[in-house]
Amino acid sequence: MFCNQCQEALNVIGCTKNGVCGKKGEVADLQDRLLYVLKSVSYYNLKARELGLNEETADKIVLDAFFATLTNTNFDKQAIESYIKKGFEIRDSIKAKLPAGTLPAEEDLPDVAKVTPENITGMDVAVHSTQNEDVRSLRELLTYGMKGMAAYAHHAYILGYKDEEIFKFIEKGLVATTDDTIGVDDLIGLVLECGQKGVSVLALLDKANTETYGSPEPTAVNIGVRGNPGILISGHDLLDLEQLLEQTKGTGIDVYTHGEMLPANSYPAFKKYDNFAGNYGNAWWRQNEEFEKFNGPVLMTTNCIIPPRESYRNRIYTTGVVGFEGLPHIHEKEDGTKDFTSLIEQAKMSKPPEQLESGTIMGGFAHEAALSVADKIIDAVKTGKISRFMVMAGCDGRHKERAYYTEFAKALPENTVILTAGCAKYRYNKLDLGDIGGIPRVLDAGQCNDCYSLVVIAQKLAEAFGLEDINDLPISYNIAWYEQKAVLVLLALLSLGVKNIVLGPTLPAFVSPNVLKVLVDNFNIRPNTTVEEDMKVLLG
């Protein structure tokens, strides 16, 4: 295997035997093959799309299977093999529908169009099959950005929201990574287009979530426990949460969020459930100790799952695109619903959660809530009560170097406000940083996709101050990345013209020196260093 798609890539180069994440080499190799099959599906669906014959089954397999290859999402060999089998079936179905003359002669077809279940095992389809370092780097940057795009499009899709242009771009991008006639300049263009489409998919998901569940509102979220047995839900999927809450109401079972599900506590639609108890624990990487102490069943809805300990292995379930060998999987029924009876019955026989902490933390400051007090914020900036906004969005991770973000938040002057989204928030959202005239010094917009809210807030503030360039606002960016959703968010920010981003805790292993130079020259991206040095740069 060779995998360097996440921030934990071994020695900032790549994992070659097993992943630091826990992914086995055999699964990594299968995921490489799956990705190549999705490129083949995309080749034919693009041809079909030109004729109005494209299939939604192709769009769905690309979203689902692409998402399954994200870091910490699907470790199940059989699930990946099933995606490969289904991909070939859909590919062949599309191919059979194409009118004669649509395709080149068989001998002129590219390899990606001729791949079969029989010959794919002997093909070199891994990252290093691309020899040119810069082409390889740009193909990876594009691929990982599109993985994030597929994940967000998947979340919107299950709520009934889709955008054909996003499907089309993902297919175009996947096929482009197999075309040796597409050089560095064109790949840079595709990477930038990926960022533009990233803004579109973030806006689509924001619309899907808010139109379905209401706009998040400032909420004091309980982080303690109650005396009832509970079910813990982790990941990002709000539809799974809705169904779980509906099925557990009146049962005496409480439901707690974990990790990136924390922002669900701020959506109006979920507040009607008396058994929605609050948030338990912290970011994904602490799940081993926290799931162990929860005592009840745990539902993993999307990334991020890590190899479970034996102590709770008999009470952790996967659903959706998540998979881990040996764990029970809750499948979606034909009508789109899921039956969580097995979790509910197990919860009834479980002890209540062990308390980890107590009190509340504030959330729910997405763009609508933040902009509802825009006048107050603008006045605070004009009077000097707020000197700067610090965007500290992104991902958390287990490396000790990430303590930097806690220390950075502590060291910020008292007249600065942190804007955050994603699980990076757990490094500082429980610090007592106070408020500025009633405005909390940590404004949490939500999940990683809610970085879109931070962009909307910045754009509206720029309008209010009469600025044409959001880089002229008193806003700085200290972004923490971990996986491929964060890659897309970064590309989306760049496509909007955001410059001077500090990125950490390490730069992506897949970015070559020449590609990094392009990012530095055009956007002034730089790696984080020390709290003291970065504070000087970011506070201007």
Curated annotation (Swiss-Prot):
Its main location: cytoplasm. Gene3D superfamilies: 1.20.1270.20, 3.40.50.2030. CDD domains: HCP (cd01914). [4Fe-4S] cluster binds at C3, C6, C15, C21. GO terms for cellular component: cytoplasm. The keyword RNA-binding does not apply. The keyword Cell inner membrane does not apply. GO terms for molecular function: 4 iron, 4 sulfur cluster binding; hydroxylamine reductase activity; metal ion binding; peroxidase activity. HAMAP family: Hydroxylam_reduct (MF_00069). This is Hydroxylamine reductase. It comes from Methanosarcina mazei (strain ATCC BAA-159 / DSM 3647 / Goe1 / Go1 / JCM 11833 / OCM 88) (Methanosarcina frisia).
